[in-house]
Amino acid sequence: MKKLYPFVLINIFISSIIAIRFFLVPEASFHWSAMVFSIFAVLGHFFSAYLLLLIICTPLLLLKQFIRNIILAILFSFFQIGLYIDTIVFEQYRFHINQSVLSMVFSGQIVDFSMLTYLLMLVLIVISFCAEYFILYFVNNKLVLSQKKSKIILLSTIFLFSSFLISHVVHMIAFYYAYSPIMAVKEYIPLYRPFTSKKIMSFFDVNGQRKVVYNKNNSNANVYYPKNPLVINPDNNKPKNIIFIVLDSWRYDTFSEEISPNTFRFVKQNNGVVFDKHYSTGNATRTGIFGLFYGIPGTYWDAFLRNSIPSLFITTLQKENYNIGIFTSAKVSAPEFDRTVFVTIKNLRISSKDGSASSRDKQITDDWLAWYKTRDASKPTFSFLFYDAPHAYDFPADSLVKFKPIGDLNYMTLNNDTDPLPIFNRYKQSVYYDDSLLQNVYDELVKSNSLEDTIVVITGDHSQEMNDNKLGFWGHNGNYTDAQTKVPFIIIGGKELEKIKGNSRKLTSHEDVVPTLMKHYLYVKNDISDYSTGYDLFSSIVDRNWLLMSNYSSYAVKTSSDIYLVNRLGISHHMDLHNREINETPNYQYIYEAMNHMRYFFQPEKNSLSNKLD
């Protein structure tokens, strides 16, 4: 073990040198603080990774030295080769290698390797193996651990361990204060998961000095959003009012005359367009709301959070001098929408008063009514109402229960054998309650004579499963089936909406909302591909074969017949629409197209966003 440890140290420094390539990608730009941090982060990260590998290899000490050296040389050489290949993948795609990338490459559908490529790979493997074996041979047979050399090894270990601690502590502080130059480093290092803890930081931040460090012209972002500067309303057209009404965890099958009668009637009376096959951009609030306000996949969340990049939809509203009212039942800072979507809004309403979800929902309704009645009516208005009762299965205790039998929710006892009916009835009751609150909003829009000049978007951030797939899934953030991703989606707002009815039975996504509103109601003249990967709902949707969805730790490419999931470890699963594994080859062309959408805003050049991407 004593002689194996110097071998590990040498490999740590070799990997650190290879990792420099991650930071040399075109257009990469780093603040000096990020450059210093990246040194500690890379060294500390590989120190922990190789220590883990060393522990795994400990049983090899029982083998003969020759056999042990061959196995170690193979393992460590493949580790270094994998790292080098990852630098190539990262340079081209701006994300790290994973199983789905490997499957796509070796499927033969997307990439064809020449004989020269295979020969070069073989040469690389041979050279790497020989180098590792030579290092092992030297360490075992030639290296004499004198007192001086032992001291060097000890100091190296102390330095590497200190780098590990420093990088994690610094990242925790940077994350708390939203210091993007430091946070941006994370995306460059493979499998790097630096420490974050708001609780620890808030303990030291006794004076409440936490703030968002937002730089309007962040040159360190390495995110090209938009692709070109926006040309906004050059003809000075009169913009319309816009209101987003979003219910957390709203199932598509609970928009009905029975469960949400007020909304159902309001939509019918005002010729609203109801979309039958609409999906969120995720199965969790973070990515669902992100896609709704940005018009791009939720996979960009981490990069946009690290760099505090606001929604172009919101900044366009601000440039057009809109009244903006953000009313969320739950905290707008969890997830960190105050550091992403709404980062440019001053005096942002962070939270409602403490209380149950249903009481907070009533509070945001009352707050919105008070704000809306006293707004500056000479200016256009945007408002966002985000209700939480369905997410919590909550309604006031004195409510008249409409859906029976009704049961209490206890996540500890939920399993595949639990009867969903009482729980589903509780959920329906919570939707029914929020619908009663929304009648006040609808009445005010009519009473104030502003409805004719208002675009109303009604939807959910994601859906809510009641063990629909009979696999023990309850709630959301668990899979990408319809039960967790399909949501109601309705647009109300004037005769011109007749033009979008042709898409109401087609596959649509939260990504389509921003480009539709930006183009037709905020009069942005740019190509949609400058700022979104979504579709214009006023134009006929053709050849949409897949949707990209994500959550906190995975993403999925969903088609009309299957789901291709990639988890946080990069391991892929090919499943049917009910989340059961299938032994079939997925359509790697679709996966390739989806990956191009995932990297599109990480590339300075503007490539095509058609179904045949380069």
Model regions and ranges:
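Transmembrane and membrane-interface helices of multi-pass
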Residues: 1-189
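Stable alpha-helical elements in mature extracytoplasmic
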Residues: 259-263, 309-313, 360, 364-368, ...
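Generic structural signal for small/hydrophobic residues in well-ordered secondary structure
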Residues: 43, 248-250, 292, 317, ...
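Active-site-proximal alpha/beta segments of enzymes that process anionic O-linked groups
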Residues: 159-411, 521, 534
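Histidine-centered active-site microenvironments of extracellular/periplasmic hydrolases
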Residues: 446, 450-495, 545
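A short beta-strand-to-alpha-helix junction
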Residues: 304-309, 421-434, 479-485, 498-515, ...
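Membrane-interface soluble catalytic domains
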Residues: 5-9, 64, 136-140, 151-157, ...
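A long, amphipathic alpha-helix that forms part
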Residues: 191, 366-373, 408-454
